Amino acid sequence: MGTLIPEETLAMIGQRLSEPVTGTITSRDAQRFALAAGDRNPLYFDEAAARAAGYRTTLVPPVLLAWALNPPRPLDDLRADGLYRGEGKRVTLNVKRVMFGGEEWEFLEPVFAGDTITSETRLKSLEEKSGGSGPFVLQMTETTYTNQDGAVVARAVGRSIAR
């Protein structure tokens, strides 16, 4: 094998795929997300309930981290690989298509309304494999979410399948 992953792409493993993105998550953002998801947990809406539970203020629904730091942009700005034009390094593979293969999250610390979060995504691994319909590449990325105090609050490992 080895024909689907160019050498220069292998050299990208461990590198950052784009500049870090930083944003502050407001209570309004958190509450709107929770309502849209049908999650009426009082810890997202009621500061007194959050304090009674031992938190400093209301919490943020954990998966909101994936969306809160990326402002909406026109569909025409998207590249074929799902990234916006002018953003990030392209992971070049000798394949025709790439599809989402799942994502695993690890939530390490609570995120609070008003926290400023920075996300950073790196290419974790590239592995050429053989499947029933031929060779493919399993691509793994790792996104780390850090709060304003430098604490890592979450980590997401994403998988893409390229063939």
Language-model segment annotations:
Residues M1-S18, F100-R163:
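HotDog/MaoC-like acyl-thioester-processing domains
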Residues G2-G102:
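Hot-dog-fold acyl-thioester-processing enzymes
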